[in-house]
């Protein structure tokens, strides 16, 4: 068991080192030259700071200062997609999921528009964007299913729906164990070529075409993604796992981390089911504390290269967070 835990930790840490290197081979197609950033700001104690204005922010792309074209304060409404994992792995705690989802919706502002998507063997839009809290609650209650995990298909549907929300600020909250069926099958087929210790380093989660397709679209639309990772996807909780199972589950969890990091969101890990409601409420608070900044890059070349983004606030004691960058294509 001690060896198993060490192996899992190695896989999780190792994959993090190679994320940006692999991204150099990936190209993002941005629909517009305008770059949109959702930006969170906290103080030294981690408390959200919501009283800033445009003059408090400075944006850099590849170290070059950029002119901010537009600025939206934290009170500006959001369009939020709530994605619920209704695959077979969540059958034992559906009521906990529903009650936790209610807490998330209750913590949003009345003007925020919410769409609800469920996924299992299928991906279903339970309700389109609405401010009608009763309709949203009915969708959460009705969410159901079993079978496979179509996580990335659900994310693709969510991004397509957000495309119709115009200039509204956009976010996705996705509850899942991260073990997408299609991605897992691809990983398994790939790992079958390796044996023994080779399995532990062969799989590079950041090279997944399924993942990078979602990252391309989310970057182009300025969408922030907040995964809530269920304990059923934790490689530490597998019973007597094989090296291949450990590798696949660790890759699935790392892909959730990449989704959050690349889009400026946060991966919240649910270690115990009773934590779910609190974490949902915390994510809602994070969303409500986001500013939105837009700029047009001074480097107009669409050469497919990675553009690193850095955003600073005028008070050096405050900490800002946004997406890491984009590929200029």
What is each PLM-predicted segment?
Residues 21-329:
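Scaffold/interface architecture of coatomer-like assemblies
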Residues 6-16:
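Bacterial N-terminal signal peptides
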Residues 1-3:
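N-terminal secretory signal peptides that target proteins for export/translocation
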Residues 5, 20-21:
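Residue-level detector of intrinsically disordered, flexible termini
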């Amino acid at each position: 068991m001690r060896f198993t835990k060490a192996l899992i930790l190695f896989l999780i840490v190792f994959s993090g080192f190679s994320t940006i290197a692999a991204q150099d081979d990936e190209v993002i197609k941005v629909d517009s030259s305008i770059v949109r950033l959702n930006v969170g700001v906290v103080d030294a104690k981690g408390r959200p700071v919501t009283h800033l204005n445009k003059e408090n922010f400075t944006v850099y792309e590849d170290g070059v200062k950029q002119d901010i074209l537009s600025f939206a304060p934290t009170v500006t409404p959001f369009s939020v997609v709530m994605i619920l994992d209704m695959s077979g792995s969540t059958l034992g705690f559906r009521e906990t999921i529903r009650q936790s989802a209610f807490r998330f919706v209750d913590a949003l502002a009345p003007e925020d528009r919410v769409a609800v998507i469920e996924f299992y063997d299928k991906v279903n839009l339970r309700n389109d964007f609405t401010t009608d809290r009763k309709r949203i609650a009915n969708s959460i209650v009705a969410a159901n299913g079993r079978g496979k995990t179509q996580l990335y298909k659900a994310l693709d549907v969510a991004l397509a729906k957000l495309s119709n929300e115009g200039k509204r600020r956009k976010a996705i909250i996705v509850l899942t164990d991260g073990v997408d069926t299609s991605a897992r099958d691809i990983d398994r087929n790939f790992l079958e070529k390796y044996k023994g210790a080779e399995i532990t380093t062969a799989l590079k989660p950041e090279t997944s075409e399924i993942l990078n397709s979602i990252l391309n679209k989310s970057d182009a639309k300025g969408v922030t993604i907040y995964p809530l990772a269920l304990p059923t996807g934790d490689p530490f909780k597998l019973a007597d796992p094989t090296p291949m199972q450990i590798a696949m589950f660790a890759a699935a969890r790392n892909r959730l981390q990449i989704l959050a990091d690349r889009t400026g969101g946060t991966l919240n890990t649910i270690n115990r089911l009773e934590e779910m409601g609190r974490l949902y409420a915390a994510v809602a608070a994070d969303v409500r504390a986001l500013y939105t900044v837009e700029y047009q890059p001074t480097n107009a070349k669409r050469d497919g290269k990675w553009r690193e983004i850095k955003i600073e606030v005028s008070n050096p004691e405050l900490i800002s967070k946004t997406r890491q960058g984009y590929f200029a294509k």
